[in-house]
């Protein structure tokens, strides 16, 4: 219910309370039991008012006055008037109390909403801090991984350079082996020193001469 509708409803109740009070006043004059209750209540109010005024009069030094009860017509009229005014006052007071209670409840709800919003913001701040911490850890790990990747790339480059050097050495060894003849090829390339057959046969057919013997004997 909106505040405007509530105020209009309260004004309507206050406006309707006046004719209702007049109806109560009329019923008090016509209804027997209601009339009796109004008379008793009006006489009680008259006595209470007289005592209060008598006390004030005595304090001010005035003369004592004898209490005279109200007649039935005045008592009924006074009682009915009091009841109607009491009804109007009750309706107006109830409307004021309801508006006050509604305003307090609205303020309490607003405070609760603000408290919930603050609590939600606090939880959001905690969640954001946790996310930032996780991002910091992830960034740190990312940096470490990037550093490791750079080291791996550098190592791979070193391996590539080493592999190139090895291939170069193997090619040079292969070239050197091709240019250097083997032992068998060297043996085949060296000529053999054979004694001619004719010389050997001549030595066998012609033994040493006698002159040679005499020289050797002497």
Swiss-Prot record:
Residues 129-179 form a coiled coil. One of its GO terms (biological process) is regulation of lipid metabolic process. Keywords: Coiled coil. Residues 176-189, 208-218 have a biased composition (Polar residues). Residues 194-206 have a biased composition (Basic and acidic residues). The keyword Transmembrane helix does not apply. One of its GO terms (cellular component) is mitochondrial outer membrane. Belongs to the OPA3 family. This is OPA3-like protein. It comes from Schizosaccharomyces pombe (strain 972 / ATCC 24843) (Fission yeast).
């Amino acid at each position: 219910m909106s505040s405007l509708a509530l105020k209009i409803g309260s004004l309507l109740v206050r406006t309707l309370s006046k004719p209702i009070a007049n109806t109560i006043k009329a019923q008090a004059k016509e209804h027997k039991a209601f009339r009796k209750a109004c008379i008793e209540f009006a006489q009680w109010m008259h006595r209470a008012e007289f005592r209060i005024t008598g006390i004030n009069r005595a304090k001010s030094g005035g003369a004592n006055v004898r209490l005279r009860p109200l007649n039935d017509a005045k008592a009924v009229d006074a009682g009915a008037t009091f009841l109607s005014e009491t009804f109007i006052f009750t309706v107006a007071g109830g409307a004021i109390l309801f508006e006050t209670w509604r305003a307090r409840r609205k303020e309490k709800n607003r405070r609760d909403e603000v408290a919930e919003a603050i609590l939600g913001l606090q939880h959001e701040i905690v969640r954001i801090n946790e996310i930032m911490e996780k991002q910091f850890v992830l960034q740190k790990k990312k940096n470490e991984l990037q550093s490791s990747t750079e080291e791996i790339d550098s190592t791979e480059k070193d391996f590539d350079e080493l592999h190139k050097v090895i291939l170069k050495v193997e090619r040079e060894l292969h070239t050197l082996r091709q240019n250097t003849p083997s032992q068998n090829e060297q043996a085949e390339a060296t000529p053999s020193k054979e004694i001619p057959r004719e010389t050997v046969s001549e030595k066998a057919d012609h033994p040493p001469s006698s002159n040679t013997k005499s020289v050797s004997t002497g």
